[in-house]
């Protein structure tokens, strides 16, 4: 029994090393292509440990936890770049390129406001509010969830419902100012849905979070 527990802990640590490294790279947004195969290697190691009968973290908990952390990190990094580093070469290339292809709010009057960065209506309010609240809360909740803590599971529920609210309000914002956000871009509404579809992850996680056996999480 002790040998089984030790093998399980070793397998979990080995998988988490790859998963954490991949998540950090993907969460940086710029290095996401490098991070994805590293992350998938961690998923494969965890899957192999489960097939070998070892007691490791459930795959669904692992995927939801890491993907929530990655989602929050990508948004926090991208918006922080626009909020703080908007005059950097990286921002002026990536953000205006994004604006030219998908969302003209990141191209229209870029760096002409007193704050700098995106000039899309309401965008700066979203950036300040969500970086300081929801994204940091979701990263903390994801870490607690991956550690199988009950507070992590509870805060995952709270922040996922907040994600639903954010998604709905952001859709309204993009619709209300469609004449600014979609004017002259290469991929207008269709392009926006292509990348925005990934933001429905809170919708997908909520049923599991409400129905999972809470006894698997510890105080």
Regions found by a protein language model. Name each.
Residues 21-27:
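Membrane-interface alpha helices of multi-pass inner-membrane proteins
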Residues 2-16, 27-219:
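Topology signature of small-to-medium multi-pass alpha-helical membrane proteins
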């Amino acid at each position: 029994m002790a040998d089984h527990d030790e093998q399980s802990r070793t397998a979990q640590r080995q998988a988490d090393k790859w998963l954490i490294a991949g998540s950090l790279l993907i969460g940086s947004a710029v290095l996401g292509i490098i991070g994805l195969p590293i992350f998938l290697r961690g998923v494969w190691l965890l899957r192999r440990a489960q097939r070998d009968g070892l007691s490791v973290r459930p795959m669904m908990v692992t995927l939801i936890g890491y993907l929530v952390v990655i989602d929050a990190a990508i948004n926090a990094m991208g918006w922080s770049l626009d909020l703080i580093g908007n005059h950097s070469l990286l921002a002026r290339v990536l953000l205006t390129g994004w604006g030219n292809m998908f969302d003209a709010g990141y191209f229209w009057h870029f760096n002409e406001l007193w704050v700098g960065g995106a000039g899309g209506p309401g965008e700066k309010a979203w950036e300040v509010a969500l970086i300081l609240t929801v994204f940091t809360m979701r990263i903390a909740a994801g870490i607690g969830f991956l550690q199988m803590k009950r507070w992590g599971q509870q805060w995952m529920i709270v922040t996922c419902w907040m994600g639903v609210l954010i998604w709905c309000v952001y859709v309204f914002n993009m619709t209300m100012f469609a004449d600014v956000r979609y004017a002259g871009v290469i991929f207008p509404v269709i392009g926006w849905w292509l990348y925005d579809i990934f933001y429905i992850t809170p919708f997908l996680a909520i049923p599991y979070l409400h129905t999972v056996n809470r006894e698997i999480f510890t105080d």
